[in-house]
Amino acid sequence: MDVETVEKEAIEKLEKVSNAQELEQFRVEFLGKKGKITSLMKNLKNLPPEERPAYGKRVNELREKVERLFSEKKKQIEELLERERMEKMRVDVTLPGARRKVGHSHPVLKVMEEIERIFVSMGFDVVEGPEIETTWHNFDALNTPEWHPARDEHDSFYITDELLLRTHTSPVQIRTMLERKPPIAIISPGKVYRRDYDATHLPMFHQVEGLHVDRDLSVAHLKFTLEEFARRMFGKNARIRLRPSYFPFTEPSFEVDVYLSGYGWLEILGAGMVDPNVFLNVGYDPEEWTGYAFGMGVERISMLKYGITDIREFVRNDVRFLSSY
């Protein structure tokens, strides 16, 4: 194959190249190590010595010409690809906007945040603590003796003999009192764990517990705080009542009910005056300081607020249910 034939073939084929893949095939065929132009140069040794300079010059000129045409074609293809890419990215700003799908808060989270807002507006700080607790913080410091049913392994998730998943957020109150001097007013929201699962109980649920320590606090202060909370959470006509109960960390202790129109009296939380033994465990003088504490299940409040009858709906991840609140 002579130089003129290769030149003619290269020009004709290059004109037909329309994409990067075809361009690469052309490069290999004509400019590659085993390409046709390279083969022409290798043929130089077969020519008589007097013909070699002119032939070599002609082949080099052909290579330069084909390389130049190749570069021009490559640039054309790259520009074409860039135009196509830009065309795909073109935005018609005259078109109407498209609404983006967004999620929304889980009903339990919404109620948790509402509870926090209510108590923060009443002067309480929000404090959090670890979900894996020592038995001392979870039970002993809260005046809960070893024989108490709450400490049974059938009711609590133990990790070791001394560590467990907290059964309430009251340990946060202990940690706070160990770190701060009174007076204090805190709430401690978070996850808690108990071995229970039915229509009204979950093995993992959410609590908000509160503690207020100051001089000369009484049940009257506790009742006022809970009345204010009930009115803000359930409406200005909500009423509460306190029924005697027992908790190892408060004395006296109460179950607190709220009266809701259409439902009657419904239990919403437990509360009481802090037991002096709890103060002694954290280094507070019970002769100088008094305090009240309360705790509520957020799922329970959510069920009452939204009229939900089965607590398990909160964890079934049914979008139809969750999107209703």
From Swiss-Prot:
Keywords: Aminoacyl-tRNA synthetase, ATP-binding, Cytoplasm, Ligase, Magnesium, Metal-binding, Nucleotide-binding, Protein biosynthesis. GO terms for cellular component: cytoplasm. It comes from the Bacteria. GO terms for molecular function: ATP binding; magnesium ion binding; phenylalanine-tRNA ligase activity; tRNA binding. Mg(2+) binds at E251. InterPro entries: aa-tRNA-synth_II, aa-tRNA-synth_II/BPL/LPL, Phe-tRNA-synth_IIc_asu, Phe-tRNA_ligase_II_N, Phe_tRNA_ligase_alpha1_bac, Phenylalanyl-tRNA_Synthase, tRNA-bd_arm. HAMAP family: Phe_tRNA_synth_alpha1. This is Phenylalanine--tRNA ligase alpha subunit. The keyword Metal-binding applies.
